[in-house]
Amino acid sequence: MSEDIYQNLKQLGGETRIPASPEEAELERVANPQADVAYNVRFTAPEFTSLCPMTGQPDFAHLVIDYVPGPWLVESKSLKLFLTSFRNHGAFHEDCTISIARRLVDFLDPQWLRIGGYWYPRGGIPIDVFWQSGTIPEGVWIPDQGVPPYRGRG
């Protein structure tokens, strides 16, 4: 495999800072060297954090992102920094979850992408947000996201 696909990466292997906002965060991508194969890639962020836009209090979620790559793969450090940039970003759970998915779809042009946002309770109610870009490509194994429904201490 040629190292040329990595030459434009600016964040991996270097010193980086956490972006101040999702808008400032720079996602990076590399050409998919297995673009002729349909396969699933999963990223799990069990400690995702954002802020309530009304109270400024922290909100926490377990995010699971599955995608079937097209021509591009997301570079994982840039994804981590993008997700971390939400820690000082005020938005409702639904907006955070869908904004992440749409940004990835626009940037990567995947064959398919889905996101599950499993938000921990605020005010006693957990909010789960699910979205996918279309029908799962035929022949691709997409495992269950593996996040059980919230049960509290029960």
Swiss-Prot record:
Question: What are its GO cellular component terms?
Answer: cytoplasm
Coiled-coil annotation: which residues?
none
**Uppermost EC category:** oxidoreductase
Pathway involvement of the protein, from the record: tRNA modification; tRNA-queuosine biosynthesis
Provide the catalytic activity annotation: 7-aminomethyl-7-carbaguanine + 2 NADP(+) = 7-cyano-7-deazaguanine + 2 NADPH + 3 H(+)
Stretch forming the signal peptide:
none
Q: Does the keyword Zinc apply?
A: no
Task: List, in alphabetical order, the GO biological process terms annotated in this UniProt record.
Answer: queuosine biosynthetic process; tRNA modification
Residues reported in the UniProt entry to bind substrate: 74-76, 93-94
E.C. number: 1.7.1.13
Keyword field contains Cytoplasm: yes
GO molecular function: any one? preQ1 synthase activity
Catalytic residues as annotated in Swiss-Prot or TrEMBL: 52, 59
Q: Which Pfam families match?
A: QueF
Q: Which InterPro entries match?
A: GTP-CH-I_C/QueF (IPR043133), NADPH_dep_7-cyano-7-deazaG_red (IPR050084), QueF (IPR029500), QueF_type1 (IPR016856)
The entry's function note states: Catalyzes the NADPH-dependent reduction of 7-cyano-7-deazaguanine (preQ0) to 7-aminomethyl-7-deazaguanine (preQ1).
**What NCBIfam families does the entry give?**
QueF-II
Q: Which HAMAP family match?
A: QueF_type1
For this entry, the protein name equals NADPH-dependent 7-cyano-7-deazaguanine reductase
Per the UniProt record, the source organism is: Ruegeria sp. (strain TM1040) (Silicibacter sp.)
- This protein's gene is called queF
